[in-house]
Amino acid sequence: MNNNLHKTVMDELTQDGDSAFRKYQDIYVGTRSISSLVKYELLTSLVSPIPGAIGFFLRRLFYKKLFAKIGDGTVIGPYLTLRCPDRISLGNNVFLDDNVTLDAKGEESHIIVGDSILIGKNSSLSCSSSEIHLGNNVSVGSNCYIRASRAPVKLGSYVTIGAHTVIISGNPSYKRLDIPMMKQKGKARGIAVGNDVWIGIGVKVVDGANIGNGCVIGAGAVVIRNIPDYAIAAGVPARIIGSRKD
């Protein structure tokens, strides 16, 4: 491949030569093992939709066979969407609400979730050849989207994320006109959020914008640059309007 071109997960999954069945295994299961495919199909098709206490018990019992790790006290709600679950680790006392998506497509992708985590209804953690790492005591509100594309997203401990927040690492390059932007090698820097951080409703955090320890990010802010420790930031783009130390 031309050194100026970036090979995406989509390239890997849509390339010629592999059968549709093999591509399905790569996208959904993450391995071409037939036994892993059968296990994935049975558990996600039969156990995932079951509501109530019976569904909770069955998922708690059988989903350990899918994930790389599930800690003690974990609760998984119905209609969990899983992609490549053997690259996903859940710590102790994790609560996944209804309709959560955990997607670890791409050979280098991993999702690592710490202890005492709440992921709200309809929220999605998605990787593309990178890693999402949540520390301990993290609350992710409903309808949030956290995406790691070619660079990691790492959240510290005691982080609160309001509903409808979007955190996405990875940037396209648009310098070359002769190469489609999605094929160009961007300079993905990743996103790091420190400890004891409050992120309000509907915040957007873009690649390379790190948030320090103890920060407060106001609702609807768009964070495009680094926010120092204990700063209070708001606006579009986000600017510092105060400090918790004052």
Language-model-detected regions and their locations in the chain:
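Terminal amphipathic alpha-helical/low-complexity segments used for targeting or macromolecular assembly
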Residues: 1-73, 158, 164-165, 171-177, ...
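Extracellular disulfide-bonded cysteine-rich modules/repeats
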Residues: 230-231
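Short beta-to-alpha loop/turn elements within the nucleotide-binding domains of ABC transporters
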Residues: 209, 221, 227, 236
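Short alpha-helical
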Residues: 108, 211, 222, 239
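Long amphipathic N-terminal alpha/beta scaffold segment
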Residues: 63, 75-85
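Flexible, glycine/small-residue-enriched loop-and-beta-strand segment within the central core
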Residues: 81-90, 95-207, 236, 244-245
